[in-house]
């Protein structure tokens, strides 16, 4: 095409970014959910493009990010329950890479207070193990709905 084209959709890792650029011939990427889930993604893409080792965040890195995100998006004037609900929207993107069984998201979705939120985050993220660069596949059960279709 005579104009630059950007690719978009499900770019969660530097490897996936490279694959999308190669397979589409696009001149760049638009990244949304992947950057919410992994705020180091742009750094990782640059490292991958330069042939360097890609930074892999540890659980503690993600825990620090969650705390910073809470401070950034929550207004002190808002009710605590509203602040928690707001952060839970972001944690839906992040949570798909925390544990393959989905227990983190299961617990997060039932939280109503900031204390509960940080207790669950500490339980799942207060460790030095590397976090997966790609989200875990969704484990759909019979009766679940996905994009309007029942499984």
Segments from the language model and where they lie:
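Alpha/beta catalytic cores of nucleotide-metabolism and tRNA/nucleoside-modifying enzymes
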Residues: 1-7, 11-151
């Amino acid at each position: 095409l005579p104009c630059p084209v950007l690719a978009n959709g499900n770019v969660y890792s530097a490897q996936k970014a490279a694959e999308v650029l190669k397979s589409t011939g696009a001149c760049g990427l638009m990244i949304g959910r992947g950057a919410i889930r992994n705020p180091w993604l742009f750094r990782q893409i640059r490292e991958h493009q330069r042939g360097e080792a890609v930074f892999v965040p540890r659980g503690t890195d993600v825990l620090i990010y969650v705390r910073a995100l809470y401070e950034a998006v929550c207004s002190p004037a808002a009710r605590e329950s509203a602040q928690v609900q707001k952060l839970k929207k972001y944690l839906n993107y992040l949570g798909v890479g925390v544990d393959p069984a989905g227990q983190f998201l299961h617990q997060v979705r039932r939280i109503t207070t900031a204390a509960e939120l940080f207790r669950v985050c500490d339980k799942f993220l207060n460790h030095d193990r590397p976090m997966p660069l790609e989200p875990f596949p969704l484990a759909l059960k019979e009766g679940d709905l996905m994009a309007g279709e029942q499984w």
